[in-house]
Amino acid sequence: MANAKEIRTKIASVQNTQKITSAMEMVAASKMRKVQDNMAATRPYAENMRKVISHVASGSLEYKHPYLEEREAKRVAYIIISSDRGLCGGLNSNLFKRALTDMRQWQEKNVEVDLTLIGSKAISFFHRFGNVIAQTSGLGDKPKLEDLLGAVTAMLEHFDDGKIDRLYLVYNEFVNTMVQNPRITQLLPHPDKDESQDSKPNDATSRWDYIYEPDPKDILNALMLRYIESQVYQGTVESIACEQAARMVAMKSATDNAGDIINDLQLVYNKARQSAITQELSEIVAGAQAV
């Protein structure tokens, strides 16, 4: 058993760590509320853009946009969004496992994989996987669309040139403070059925015809670009909200665990102190009897 002094030193060390994790928990909680507000403000736009594109894709089009045309997958690409910092539990590792599983399915079919990485953790993990076309990090808690345009544009150029035939978005979807789901959605070509919609095949609203003015090509070109930008931006905002929620939960767990360790060490310290006092008393009594 360690002596009382060593135990006191360890208790003080754990208490200092507990103060740090408690402070980080409060900071993460404060940031989470702010990023949740940002996420809630942008989510309706992203969802409505997805619905509009789904309706357009299912309608009778005068002009068939290349982003809506299915083609044989010879090479696929992923935009993977992670956090810039750690200490957020298994948030990033769960996302990376999901992405790797999906990537391996394509590789087993002899389909090459390209990557665009957003976030320092994704960059450090995936730099040895596949061909990295673009990467960016350091977006902060309130990212700007301009910071993402370079990565998005690089992927769209590859799709336009026929260098890739599928484009997927990989990110963490914010459900609530305790639940964050790793998600993979197909961006290009836009799937015939929107993954987020539970529309019935015979629904009268599932197929709409549009009249485009002045020109369907110009309108669809602009609309499809805004659609891709909105989905990538929303995925980034969702991932940031997930990061802060996961960090808050992880730091709370660490703080609670530190408290349990301190209690256990306090019991060990009390036993060690009791043993030392008992030994001293025994020595005093033995000395008195000898006299």
From Swiss-Prot:
Major localisation: membrane
Record InterPro entries: ATP_synth_F1_ATPase_gsu (IPR035968), ATP_synth_F1_gsu (IPR000131), ATP_synth_F1_gsu_CS (IPR023632)
Compartment(s) of residence: Cell inner membrane
Any GO molecular function: ATP binding
Cellular component terms per the entry's GO annotation: plasma membrane; proton-transporting ATP synthase complex
Stretches for region Disordered: 187-208
Keywords: ATP synthesis, Cell inner membrane, Cell membrane, CF(1), Hydrogen ion transport, Ion transport, Membrane, Transport
Compositionally biased tracts (Basic and acidic residues): 190-201
Membrane topology, from the record: Peripheral membrane protein
Pfam families named among the record's database cross-references: ATP-synt (PF00231)
One GO process term, biological-process aspect: proton motive force-driven plasma membrane ATP synthesis
Gene3D superfamilies the UniProt entry points to: 3.40.1380.10, ATP synthase, gamma subunit, helix hairpin domain (1.10.287.80)
Protein family: Belongs to the ATPase gamma chain family.
Function: Produces ATP from ADP in the presence of a proton gradient across the membrane. The gamma chain is believed to be important in regulating ATPase activity and the flow of protons through the CF(0) complex.
Subunit structure: F-type ATPases have 2 components, CF(1) - the catalytic core - and CF(0) - the membrane proton channel. CF(1) has five subunits: alpha(3), beta(3), gamma(1), delta(1), epsilon(1). CF(0) has three main subunits: a, b and c.
Protein name: ATP synthase gamma chain 2
